[in-house]
């Protein structure tokens, strides 16, 4: 599954950067980070991607709670360290937990389109009540806490001003 949209990929290419090769934990590379939209770049920003992805799961609501709680705990650690990139990457993984779980709630196979076409397959009858729908609600709840937190909003605004 391609998480990075072509629009985000184009931004990175215009910068002449291969995000997969940059270590964003190094001070000299931190200014290269771009927030993007939604979950853009979530699988590209190393080492954060590698660390957070190990805890990202949504197969059942129980697993989603454990995953979202762990990612939120990581968010708090990054916040306490003043690491906005880590905070934003946690937000992106929470966003991706929501969107991917919704995809499976809507289409149990994970496939939205009829094979070989752009025809959208019908939604599952239980798309609002399935285990994936509940997992999506869990991730959205935690994502909203992060995205609306005073610290995140302030640090995001500061980061945007320097992009």
Task: Label each PLM-derived region with a short phrase.
Residues 111-163:
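Intrinsically disordered, low-complexity, charge-dense segments enriched in Lys/Arg
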Residues 88-113:
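Short, charge-rich amphipathic alpha-helical segments embedded
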Residues 13-61:
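Short, charge-rich, low-complexity alpha-helical interaction segments
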Residues 1-12:
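Short, small-residue-biased leader/transition segments that mark boundaries at the very start
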Residues 62-66:
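Short helix-capping and inter-helix turn/linker motifs at the boundaries of alpha-helical repeat units
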């Amino acid at each position: 599954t391609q998480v990075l949209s072509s629009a985000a990929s184009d931004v990175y290419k215009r910068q002449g950067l291969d995000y997969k090769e940059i270590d964003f934990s190094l001070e000299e590379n931190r200014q290269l980070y771009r927030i993007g939209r939604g979950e853009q770049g979530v699988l590209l920003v190393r080492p954060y991607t590698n660390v957070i992805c190990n805890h990202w799961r949504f197969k059942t609501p129980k697993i989603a709670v454990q995953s979202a709680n762990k990612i939120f705990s990581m968010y708090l650690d990054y916040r306490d360290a003043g690491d906005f990139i880590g905070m934003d990457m946690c937000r992106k993984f929470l966003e991706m937990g929501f969107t991917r779980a919704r995809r499976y709630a809507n289409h149990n196979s994970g496939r939205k389109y009829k094979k070989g076409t752009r025809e959208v397959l019908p939604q599952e009858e239980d798309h609002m009540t399935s285990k994936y729908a509940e997992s999506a609600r869990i991730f959205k709840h935690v994502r909203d806490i992060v995205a609306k937190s005073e610290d995140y909003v302030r640090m995001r605004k500061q980061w945007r001003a320097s992009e």
